[in-house]
Amino acid sequence: MQINCISFCELLHLFTDDVNRNNEILKGACEKADFKKVERLYIGSNFCSRYFLKYVESALKGIAKLTEIESGALKVTLCVPVFSQLYIDSAKKLIKSILNEYSFIDELTVNDFGMIEFASQLNNIRLNVGRMMNKDARDVRYAEYFNLARTPEVFTLTNSVLKNYDINCYELDLTSRFLDVKNVNENVAIYYPYVFATVGNICEFAGVSLPIEKKFRSNYHCAYDCVRFANEYRNEFGNEYLKVGKTTYFKVDDFVVKADKPYRMVYEPFDGLKSKGEQK
């Protein structure tokens, strides 16, 4: 059985204090995903600490006023990226504050081992392993590899590093067109239709509006132009790519999930919601 979820990670900036607009954003995402009912939202960022720290609080204020949140029909998973030493203390403080303020958040998704240790010490919150921790190779250009049925290797972590932690769910990408989780005991959440291919350290969009001598500098302040631009690419084989912030995704519309118990499908509504620039 498929459990319908929608991720607004990397799309936090869309939410404002306009209740009607926020409800329309959710409605539009559900229509795009062809969901008659959605059971969970994913909020935050999996890939950019600066984006998370700047937008998550204002977004949650808007999301808290969604009709389905106020009625108790929707629960929320808070996703957090990897934080550098520069931001780690402020990030932990912010995460604790958010979890204390918003009771509709009942899960925390983390993307590195250090944050797993931090999150495991929090009360009344379920812990998820984020998609950044699944290191499986992924490249849609190599059809003979991508079209093989495979089980993600991240589950081997449960028998080693993660065996001492109470993990609620593993979040995955479609690293294979035929994703086999049939013999997996753990709960899984699968993001689609975009698969993250790679994440860079230096963000192209951080300095779109900056002079050339200040572009591509990881230690320079961010202009947050990722909220205004995204790049689309297509190769000669018809594969579609999308670059949002530091992250490059490829699109997979045709896929099969083999499972013998309920699993989450997490729709990413980049299409139609993300303002795209003209650069291709």
Set out the residue ranges of the language-model regions:
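Active-site pocket-lining/capping segments in soluble small-molecule metabolic enzymes
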Residues: 1-65, 74-280
